[in-house]
């Protein structure tokens, strides 16, 4: 997994007028010298899962290995507003034959409700 600022992508401008360079992330998986996956992701790779209004002001923050399951290798990705806590968590599953499936993860607040922590 290699993340890099990608100046060929549109610049993201936040509400304060600050400009941010978006990232592209390359995922390469090999097994025994055989290439299974070689794909570059941008935030647009996830456009079918993320609201277009959010996507317009967000950047692709990261992609990290999560775990290996019988379904494949799981990666966690996030698209976020730059320099903020607002993000959309995503899950990528790479099957043994290199097929990639993507899904939006639920935020903990959505799973447990906003008043899950009470004193």
Give the location of each predicted region.
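Short, solvent-exposed mixed-charge patches
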Residues: 117-119
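Structural motif
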Residues: 20-26, 83-90
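C-terminal or internal capping secondary-structure element at the end of a domain, subdomain, or sheet
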Residues: 89-107
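Beta-propeller fold detector
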Residues: 37-44, 101-109
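Acidic, glycine-rich flexible loop segments
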Residues: 48-89, 95
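Surface-exposed acidic loop/strand-edge motifs in secreted or periplasmic proteins
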Residues: 1-62
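A short local loop/turn or secondary-structure capping micro-motif enriched for an aromatic residue
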Residues: 45-48, 83-84, 109-113
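Residue-level signal for secondary-structure boundary sites
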Residues: 35, 83-85, 100
